[in-house]
Amino acid sequence: MDVHPPRQPIHTVKDFLLHLLTITVGLFIALSLEAAVESLHHRHLVRDARQNLHREIAANYQQYAMNAKWVAENRDQLARNIELLRELRHGKKLDPANLGWHWQWNSFSGVAWRAARDNGAVSYMAPDLIASYSWIYLQQDYINSTALAIVGEESKAGAALEAAADPSNLSPLEIQTLLVKSAEINLSLSTLQSTMKGLEDMYIEQSQNRAAETP
């Protein structure tokens, strides 16, 4: 922003005041335009970030339904494992194919939220909006890490059966260890389901708020 000297010499106080007024008005207009352009840029930044966040949250909500289905199916399998292991403990022969310790999990995405923080869009959002997005993504991250930890534990749980090749080759101690581990994993999944229900409520609230904003 440049301020140029007067083209004509200033001879009177009136000329000086007029020139000062011209400079002041010019600076005010320039600063106002600059602020308006910057404000418009910030609004566009927030608008684009929110659109990306809503798309990502909607996609995560769809993935949530699949993850919830897999967790429920895995708990059913664990319940069967526990019953079969109890029968095995009492000497009943089992088909190895009926026992299993494995399940699927697809982590929720947080790319749009990280991008909004990195490009500064979050800093121009309203505080309640920031809090809403923050809680969703914090909950997602916690659930992702918890689920992946359970996946790791469950993957190791069936190692004894894998080594034995046949359930009848398992020792009483190995059977008891498998029983306890299966029960522990099932309890962990029960807690995970409760936490996931809280995330689902957040997704629903976010969707309702978005619908209310749409004209």
Question: Residue locations for each model-derived region?
Answer:
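Residues within alpha-helical transmembrane segments of multi-pass membrane proteins, especially transporters
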Residues: L21-F28, S32, A36
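Long, hydrophobic alpha-helical segments that serve as membrane-spanning/inserting helices
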Residues: M1-K14, A35-P215
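N-terminal signal-anchor/signal peptide hydrophobic helix marking the start
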Residues: I10-V25
